[in-house]
Amino acid sequence: MTIQILPPQLANQIAAGEVVERPASVIKELVENSLDAGATRVDIEIEKGGSKLIKIHDNGSGISKEDLGLALSRHATSKLSSLDDLDAILSFGFRGEALASISSVSRLTLTSRTADQVEAWQAYAEGSDMAVKVIPAAHPVGSTVEAVDLFFNTPARRRFLKSDKTEFTHIDEWLKRIALVRSDIHFTLKHNGKVVRNYRATNTQDQYLQRLAQISGKKFAEQAIEINCQHDDLKLTGYVQSPFFETPASDTQYFYVNGRLVRDRLVNHAVRQAFAEHETGEQASYVLMLELDPHQVDVNVHPAKHEVRFHQSRYVHDYIFQALQSALHQVGRLAIDSDNKLDTDSHSQSHERGHSAYGVAEPSHSRHDYSHQTAPSTKASTETNRERFSSPISAVPSHTSDVQSRGGATSSYRQQAELPSAAAIASYAELLKTPDVDQGNRGNKELQANVSMPPILAGQYWVLTQEEQLLLLPVRIISTWLLQHEISNKLDSGLVSQPLLMPVSISMDETWSDTLAERELLLRKIGIEVTIRLGQLIIKKVPPYLRQSQLVAVIPDLLQWLRFEEPSNEALASWLAKHDDKRFESAPDTWLAFSQLDDNVQDELIKKAKVLPWQSWLEEYPSD
């Protein structure tokens, strides 16, 4: 067959394979066009799960008659005109493919009117050349897109559609996602003539929490902690599930970048790492929105725009992690410290003035500001947060509101639940902590009191004397050796595995399957549990030494190492210790463990110290 240019309709149908996967993807493209047009209300009507009819009506700016013919053409868009525009794109659409692709696999009509037009116009494409016809019509300001009989001319694609109920579920799920980030828009969804969703526009935080409860459930809205912080051009807002509840509030896990819902491994890792020490064995729920300079993120890396690429990925990762970690720590301290101070009188006063999570009473004039209520032990951390970010993190349970603080009525879903006791909170918080690797060598207060630690220089070097020598012994060298020795002793019986809060998914390398099969017992011995699913390596459990490491980089490095050799216990212990040198993170703890070693072991480790030439200094600077 000779090379030939494809007919326009066939080319559009091929392109539709990426853009139009199912009715939900059609609605996604059309509604996003409505939002780009400045609509404040979007009405969605479908029949038979969207396979029979999809109709989107909005009150946006509309399309002029002159542009209507181009609207159904490929690569025609009003969103950008140069490569510089693409580097700073903030609109949902920008490729100019959606309408052309949808019209090639359905009977599509586009009716629109602008504010300065007297009459509306309707456009539709017909024939193999996809010629666009424009005729007069009656329509208010805005646009209506109607797609009938989806995949009517591509029966193979139509056979892949699921049941009407399943397709509706996908549509409903997508609408929830967009309704959470665009709370300023009024959305309605009608299925088979019946209104099934009605999300009214919100103007206040109280109204947004009502939408949050409507979409993600009452339980999540009651437990949610508000996140609101900014640093330079990065801003993170939203809600996360409180770590002090054993069961997941919902299966809500939405992350938005500049208003666009994305799935990103870097983001997932940052969230998982922030929740690591609060692990409940279930996945945390969250609705988070990241805003940043559009020049710092590339949204043109996925056909459906579900993925993005950050130019400074590590910076973004650390920012998200620190913001969430600080918020969770602040709430944890308030939950325990403040609850211990409550008595019967303060508890009764909390009902008069309004109260926030875990029984922390809030004055009537306060709104999401705990900066003056924090216990003394929390003050330093709060100040650190204020130095790190240009505005403090508002880590406040969502059911504290202006309405409550003014003594007014509140929605039923935000009524205060029975609070756990201080002892219950404290004991549960202790359970949430990552177990110590060796609790026997920690917290021995009596032994620590009897052991005198030598002077320490810059918090990193002990100053020792041995005969006529003055030595500098690095704390890190000793802490690393102690950890390596500890791991080595435990490897014979195998390390304890800890389940991850959220399993980590990594794209499979073709060489990993053989390595996983050959080293299965070894991986199990060091506490790593993985599975393979749909071309992805799913990391489910790791030893405590790897909990804070970058698993997306560490595990591939480990598999590459295991591919060529079977390391000894000493080598494995050294590798694990290298990825967790925080076991003896304080000099007193490290010295306490060091002092319990045999004398000959201590002597060998002291040989790693640096000798200071103090005699030559005295000769160079003699005393008068």
UniProtKB/Swiss-Prot annotation:
GO terms for cellular component: mismatch repair complex. Pfam families: DNA_mis_repair, HATPase_c_3, MutL_C. InterPro entries: DNA_mismatch_repair_CS, DNA_mismatch_repair_MutL, DNA_mismatch_S5_2-like, HATPase_C_sf, MutL/Mlh/PMS, MutL/Mlh/Pms-like, MutL_C, MutL_C_dimsub. The lineage of its organism: Bacteria, Pseudomonadati, Pseudomonadota, Gammaproteobacteria, Alteromonadales. Residues 340-415 are annotated as: Disordered. GO terms for molecular function: ATP binding; ATP hydrolysis activity; ATP-dependent DNA damage sensor activity; mismatched DNA binding. One of its GO terms (biological process) is mismatch repair. The keyword Cell membrane does not apply. Disulfide bonds: none annotated. The keyword Ligase does not apply. It comes from Shewanella sediminis (strain HAW-EB3). Residues 372-383, 391-415 have a biased composition (Polar residues). It comes from the Bacteria. This is DNA mismatch repair protein MutL. Keywords: DNA damage, DNA repair. Belongs to the DNA mismatch repair MutL/HexB family. The gene is mutL. This protein is involved in the repair of mismatches in DNA. It is required for dam-dependent methyl-directed DNA mismatch repair. May act as a 'molecular matchmaker', a protein that promotes the formation of a stable complex between two or more DNA-binding proteins in an ATP-dependent manner without itself being part of a final effector complex. Residues 340-355 have a biased composition (Basic and acidic residues).
